[in-house]
């Protein structure tokens, strides 16, 4: 039997891009291609790129260059594939003219066509080697579930719609089938992602779909309830990311707080507020009522006291005054957000914010970002310290002789904190990766927790 053709794969960018990579790799394996872990062991290389900010663009271009140097046969996909250069031609083709093919994001079919053109598929594909859940690039016990592609918003700092297009929601039955297959494969935590999770179904007018004979609207609240019911059957978690602060978010909070889904639909919201001053938010083309946001955050916590809120912000946006920045700091103190990230504003090629007046010097932008993070870390440290002495449910991510590393319901992988768990002293308390364990919290710093089983 002849050796199967081998494809190398480099995946860059956000969790949405990671899901695209998983779909491409799943299709490659379904058609009988092997995935090579090295450049020299591959017949060609696929590079999935990111093009959101300048640093990501450069990282992607460097990765393409490295793949060309080490292998020579490279197909490029992802957000950077849709980006144009100053001359109007494709940026990748201009910088790296030797690439075999370039596609935009979420383009499994186009990538496979390019692979077929340069590396014909085997005659006897090993379809049985591909699990129903597909090939995943995350650890076995958690996975990302992408429910839609694209975005209908036109935030002035963002170019995602120009690369990924307008919102396209996946059929609800398709999403539920993937979720079920993932749970059956041993996944203990599903991280629901998209460009705008709250907008799920807007493009199809919340059309009713069917799953196992039951009607489910193509709508965030209905989908979350269905996922929560499914997760409860498998003793698993569902975590929501990229939740735009629409009024409909209020409907999801009770699912986290009470009833059959409590403990399965996690009391966790990733809501990118971006700023708090109405004038800055208007220039960003974001919802501009910060006082109402504060009221909603307080109401959410009244309904669900255990709620963790993660958010991201931009400091030093064009035209931001010192007073407007102080308003942002006041918001962080009052809202008491649990997990916060902040970026010093950086111009992104193609973003309409580049045309706004009042661009701030680099040192001012960075100084404001640093001040923001000082305040945010003080708030986070206070909230985390309240967990000392409590017993929390922890999902174990890593195990070594020194103990385990896991996460609570308040911590998403890669971006939030962790719990350092003491080694189990009794056989009855031993744990492995993917286990849920009860941990008594004995210590905390500004970001992480320590505890014992």
UniProtKB/Swiss-Prot annotation:
The MTTase N-terminal domain, residue ranges: 5-120
TRAM domain ranges (all copies): 385-453
Cofactor details (free text): Binds 2 [4Fe-4S] clusters. One cluster is coordinated with 3 cysteines and an exchangeable S-adenosyl-L-methionine.
GO terms for biological process, alphabetical: tRNA modification
InterPro entries, per database record: Elp3/MiaA/NifB-like_rSAM, Methylthiotransferase, Methylthiotransferase_CS, Methylthiotransferase_N, Methylthiotransferase_N_sf, NA-bd_OB-fold, Ribosomal_uS12_MeSTrfase_RimO, rSAM
SUPFAM superfamilies the UniProt entry points to: Radical SAM enzymes (SSF102114)
Enzyme class: transferase
UniProt-recorded Gene Ontology molecular function terms: 4 iron, 4 sulfur cluster binding; aspartic acid methylthiotransferase activity; metal ion binding; protein methylthiotransferase activity
Annotated residues for binding of [4Fe-4S] cluster 2: 151, 155, 158
Cystine pairs: none
Gene Ontology CC annotation, any one: cytosol
Pfam family, one: Radical_SAM
Localization terms from the record: Cytoplasm
Co-factor requirement: [4Fe-4S] cluster
Enzyme Commission identifier(s): 2.8.4.4
Keyword terms: 4Fe-4S, Cytoplasm, Iron, Iron-sulfur, Metal-binding, S-adenosyl-L-methionine, Transferase
Residues reported in the UniProt entry to bind [4Fe-4S] cluster 1: 14, 50, 79
CDD domains: Radical_SAM (cd01335)
Superkingdom of the organism of origin: Bacteria
Catalytic activity: L-aspartate(89)-[ribosomal protein uS12]-hydrogen + (sulfur carrier)-SH + AH2 + 2 S-adenosyl-L-methionine = 3-methylsulfanyl-L-aspartate(89)-[ribosomal protein uS12]-hydrogen + (sulfur carrier)-H + 5'-deoxyadenosine + L-methionine + A + S-adenosyl-L-homocysteine + 2 H(+)
Residues annotated as domain Radical SAM core: 137-382
NCBIfam families per the UniProt record, alphabetical: 30S ribosomal protein S12 methylthiotransferase RimO, MiaB/RimO family radical SAM methylthiotransferase
HAMAP family for the chain: MTTase_RimO
Similarity field: Belongs to the methylthiotransferase family. RimO subfamily.
Function, as annotated: Catalyzes the methylthiolation of an aspartic acid residue of ribosomal protein uS12.
Name of the protein this chain belongs to: Ribosomal protein uS12 methylthiotransferase RimO
Species of origin: Burkholderia multivorans (strain ATCC 17616 / 249)
Name of the coding gene: rimO
């Amino acid at each position: 039997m002849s050796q199967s053709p081998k494809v190398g794969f480099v995946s860059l960018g956000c969790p949405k891009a990671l899901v695209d990579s998983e779909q491409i790799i799943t299709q490659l394996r379904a058609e009988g291609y092997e995935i090579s872990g090295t450049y020299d062991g591959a017949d060609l290389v696929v590079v999935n790129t990111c093009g959101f900010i300048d640093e990501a663009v450069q990282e992607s271009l460097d990765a393409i260059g490295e793949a060309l140097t080490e292998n020579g046969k490279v197909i490029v996909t992802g957000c950077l594939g849709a980006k144009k250069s100053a001359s109007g031609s494709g940026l990748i083709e201009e910088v790296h003219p030797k690439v075999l093919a370039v596609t935009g994001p979420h383009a499994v079919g186009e990538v496979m066509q390019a692979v077929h053109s340069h590396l014909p598929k085997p005659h006897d594909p090993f379809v049985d080697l591909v699990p129903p859940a597909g090939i995943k690039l995350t650890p076995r016990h958690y996975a990302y579930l992408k429910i839609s592609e694209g975005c209908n918003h036109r935030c002035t700092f963002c170019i995602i719609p120009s690369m990924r297009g307008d919102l396209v929601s996946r059929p609800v039955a398709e999403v539920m089938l993937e979720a079920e297959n993932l749970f059956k494969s041993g996944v203990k935590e599903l991280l629901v992602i998209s460009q705008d999770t709250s907008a799920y179904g807007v493009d199809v007018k919340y059309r009713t779909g069917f799953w196992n004979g039951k009607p489910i609207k193509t709508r965030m609240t209905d989908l979350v309830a269905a996922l929560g019911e499914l997760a409860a059957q498998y003793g698993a978690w569902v975590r929501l990311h990229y939740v735009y602060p629409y009024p409909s978010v209020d409907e999801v909070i009770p699912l986290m707080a009470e009833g059959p889904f409590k403990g399965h639909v996690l009391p966790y919201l990733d809501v990118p507020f971006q700023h708090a001053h109405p004038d800055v938010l208007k220039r960003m083309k974001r919802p501009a009522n910060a006082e109402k946001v504060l009221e909603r955050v307080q109401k959410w916590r009244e309904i669900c006291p255990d709620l963790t809120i993660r958010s991201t912000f931009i400091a030093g946006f064009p035209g931001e005054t010192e007073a407007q920045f102080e308003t942002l700091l006041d918001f962080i103190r009052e809202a008491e957000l649990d997990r916060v990230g902040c970026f010093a504003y950086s111009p992104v090629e193609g973003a309409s914010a580049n045309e706004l007046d009042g661009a701030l010097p680099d040192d001012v932008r960075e100084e404001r970002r640093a001040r923001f993070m000082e305040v945010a870390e003080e708030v986070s440290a206070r909230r985390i310290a309240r967990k000392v002495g409590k017993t929390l449910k922890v999902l174990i991510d890593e195990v070594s002789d020194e103990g385990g590393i896991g996460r609570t319901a308040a911590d998403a992988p890669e971006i939030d904190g962790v719990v350092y768990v003491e080694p189990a002293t009794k056989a009855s308390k031993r744990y492995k990766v993917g286990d849920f364990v009860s941990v008594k919290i004995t210590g905390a710093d500004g970001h992480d927790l320590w505890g014992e089983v």
